[in-house]
Design a protein with these regions (language model features):
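Hydrophobic h-region of N-terminal signal peptides that target proteins for export
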Residues: 5, 9-18
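Early exported N-terminus immediately downstream of N-terminal targeting peptides
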Residues: 49-52, 56
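Short N-proximal segments of mature Sec-exported proteins
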Residues: 95-109
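Surface-exposed patches in mature extracellular/periplasmic domains of secreted proteins
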Residues: 45-49, 87-97, 135
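Long, amphipathic alpha-helical surface segments
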Residues: 18-44, 56-62, 68-87, 107-164
Length: 164
């Protein structure tokens, strides 16, 4: 119950008052993204394998001494997010927003792969359409079902990182 109240307070605080009055908006955008990911992912435990730290999925050939410290988890998150930002560099001001989303849903889900076409979100951004709110929020499903906490996460990400 405590975590639900904390999440609701966080979301309401961001959504209600003007952006300039909040300390989080004074942070560089990359730091906002890191804070947002940490808040919603939490620090993963052994039971969350193959996810460690703040949502890093262990890849073939990667080996880590577990459990990770918060400092190690933070460094791993930053490394992963920087890597994704580079992958989305051609999207300019949207690169951090897309990297943050890809951190959670996967690069292939957005950009397409053998199993999925390029997402509608990416298609709209590539065409210059800035009306992406609904398409971004649509990435709130797990196993085909809408998850309210993921939906809230997407709204917070947009509030913190989207530039019209």
């Amino acid at each position: 119950m405590r975590i639900i109240i904390t999440i609701i307070t966080f979301v309401l605080t961001i959504a209600v008052a003007p952006a300039q009055s909040h300390g989080i908006y004074k942070m560089p955008p990359f730091e906002r993204a890191v804070c947002c990911i940490k808040f919603f992912e939490g620090l993963h435990q052994a039971k969350d394998y193959p996810y460690i730290g703040y949502g890093h999925r262990i890849q073939p050939g990667e080996h880590f001494r577990l459990p990770l410290t918060r400092k190690q988890a933070d460094a791993l998150l930053r490394r992963d997010l920087h890597k994704l930002c580079k992958m989305f560099r051609s999207y300019g001001k949207d690169s951090l927003l897309l990297a943050t989303l890809a951190y959670n849903v996967g690069y292939g889900t957005l950009m397409g792969n053998a199993n999925h076409p390029k997402s509608r979100l990416i298609q709209k951004i590539e065409s210059g359409d800035r009306n992406i709110h609904d398409d971004y929020i649509r990435f709130c499903r797990y196993k085909g079902k809408v998850v309210p906490s993921i939906r809230k996460r997407r709204k917070v990400e947009l509030l913190l990182l989207f530039h019209t």
